[in-house]
Design a protein with these regions (language model features):
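N-terminal secretory signal peptides that target proteins for export/translocation
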Residues: 1-25
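Bacterial N-terminal signal peptides
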Residues: 21-23, 29-44
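Sec/Tat signal peptide C-region and signal peptidase I cleavage site
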Residues: 45-52
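Short, glycine-/small- and polar/acidic-enriched structural segments
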Residues: 52-193, 199-209, 225-226, 233
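Short, hydrophobic secondary-structure boundary micro-motifs
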Residues: 81, 126-127, 276-277, 308, ...
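Pocket-lining segment of extracytoplasmic ligand-binding domains
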Residues: 112-113, 190-194, 198-284
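Secondary-structure end/capping motifs
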Residues: 247-335
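Hinge/cleft segment of the Venus flytrap/periplasmic-binding protein
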Residues: 326-328, 332-354
C-alpha cells in the first residue's frame, strides 16, 4: 500500500498531490528492491569506522508527519542533540526507491509501505511512529450519495492496492457492505478528481489530501462520507530504518527520536504552532492557512501516545494490529504474495526508552 504520490501514488507532494501506495503507498519500490538492498546491506556491514560516523541519511517527503522534521532542521535541534543527520527531500515513492537501493539509512513511510518495501527485499524496522492519518484520507461522494450505504450498486474510483483502497474496504466493512456490493474503477490517484467530475456514473472516489480536496472543489455538493478520522490507527506513519544502521548507530537513532518529540511539542503548543506551521508550509510551497487543515488531519504522536501505539494488540490502536490488517490487505490484493511477520518490522525499544 502506498501513500502520497505525485499525488500519493506515492505521498508525493501534498502541495502537488501525492501519498500512500503499498495499499498504503507501493509507493513504488518493488522492482529494484531485492538486488539493490543486498548491495546496500553488504556495504553497510562492511562500513569502516569513518563511514559509520557519516550523517544519518533520512528520506522524507510531503506528509505532515514527515514535514514536521523541518522544524528541527531549521531550528538546529539535531546539532543540539549531538547527532549528525542528512534529511533528503523526495517524492514519496522516490524516497522508498532510494531506501531500497541502499542510499538511505531510514525513510518516512506508512506501516503498510514498510511491509511492501520489506517484502520486496529491503528489510526495515519501524523505530518511531510519527503519526496516524486522522482525516486526510477520504472517501468523497457526489450528490445524491450522502452515506457509505449509498454506495451500494454504484461505481467508486480508487487506485487499486493503495492506501485509500484500504480505507474504502474499511468503510464498507463498518457499514455491513463488501466490495462485491459495488464496482471499483481503477485510476491513478491524481486522476481521481477528474474521474469524479467527468464520469457521470462514478459516485465517489477514495483519495488523500490534497487530492481529496481537489475532488471536493471540482464537484459542487460533494462531501466526505468516510475519512481516516473514522478509523484512527488504520494508517500509521513511521521512520523505518535499515537494520544494519539501527544496530550500529542506536545511540544516534535514540537522539533522533528525542528530537522528534521536541518537534511534536513545538507544533502542538498554541504559542509556537504558528511558527511551526510557517516552517512546514514553506517546505511544501503552501501558505500557513492552506497548510493548517492538512496538519489537523494528521494526529502527531508524542512519547506517551507512541508508547501506547507500540503496545502489542489486535486493534488499530496498536501498530501491530494495524500492520497485520495492512498485511492481510496487501496479500488479498496481490501487492505481494507471502504474508509478512509483522513483529519483525517493529522495534519500540528506543521510543519506549524516551
Amino acid at each position: 500500500m502506498k501513500r502520497f504520490e505525485s499525488v500519493r501514488t506515492s505521498r508525493a507532494s501534498l502541495a502537488a498531490p501525492a501519498r500512500f501506495a503499498s495499499a498504503l503507498r507501493v509507493r513504488g519500490a518493488l522492482a529494484a528492491a531485492a538486488a539493490a538492498l543486498a548491495l546496500g546491506l553488504t556495504a553497510g556491514l562492511a562500513a569502516t569506522p569513518a563511514q559509520a560516523a557519516a550523517p544519518l541519511a533520512i528520506g522524507y517527503s510531503d506528509w505532515p508527519g514527515f514535514v514536521a522534521f523541518q522544524v528541527a532542521i531549521e531550528k538546529g535541534w539535531f546539532k543540539e542533540a549531538g547527532v549528525d543527520v542528512n534529511f533528503q527531500w523526495f517524492d514519496y515513492s522516490a524516497s522508498l526507491d532510494a531506501f531500497s537501493a541502499g542510499k538511505l539509512d531510514a525513510v518516512g513511510a506508512t506501516n503498510g509501505d514498510a511491509l511492501v518495501t520489506g517484502a520486496s527485499g529491503a528489510k526495515n524496522v519501524m523505530i518511531l511512529l510519527t503519526d496516524y492519518s486522522s482525516g486526510n484520507d477520504m472517501i468523497v461522494a457526489k450528490p445524491p450519495v450522502r452515506t457509505v450505504e449509498g454506495l451500494k450498486g454504484k461505481k467508486v474510483g480508487v487506485e487499486v492496492g493503495l492506501v485509500d483502497h484500504l480505507l474504502l474496504d474499511t468503510a464498507l466493512a463498518k457499514h455491513a457492505l463488501k466490495e462485491s456490493d459495488l464496482t471499483l474503477v481503477n485510476a491513478k490517484t491524481n486522476e481521481l478528481p477528474q474521474v469524479l467530475a467527468s464520469s457521470g456514473d462514478v459516485a465517489a472516489v477514495g483519495a488523500w489530501q490534497p487530492t481529496a480536496g481537489e475532488a471536493l472543489k471540482r464537484v459542487p455538493g460533494s462531501r466526505p462520507i468516510f475519512t481516516s478520522a473514522d478509523a484512527p490507527g488504520l494508517i500509521y506513519d513511521a521512520i523505518t530504518v535499515n537494520p544494519v544502521s539501527l544496530q550500529s548507530r542506536k545511540a544516534d537513532w535514540a537522539k533522533v527520536i528525542k528530537v522528534w518529540y521536541r518537534c511534536v511539542a513545538y507544533i502542538n503548543d498554541p504559542k509556537t504552532q504558528p511558527d511551526a506551521v510557517k516552517i512546514m508550509s514553506a517546505r511544501v510551497g503552501l501558505t500557513p492557512a492552506q497548510y493548517l487543515p492538512l496538519l489537523k488531519g494528521t494526529h502527531l504522536l508524542d512519547s506517551a501516545a507512541a508508547r501506547k501505539a507500540f503496545t502489542k494488540g489486535d486493534g488499530l490502536d496498536s501498530v501491530y494490529g494495524s500492520s497485520v490488517n495492512a498485511d492481510k490487505f496487501n496479500v488479498r490484493n496481490a501487492v505481494y504474495k507471502q504474508s509478512q511477520n509483522v513483529s519483525a518490522y517493529i522495534d519500540p525499544a528506543l521510543a519506549n526508552a524516551q
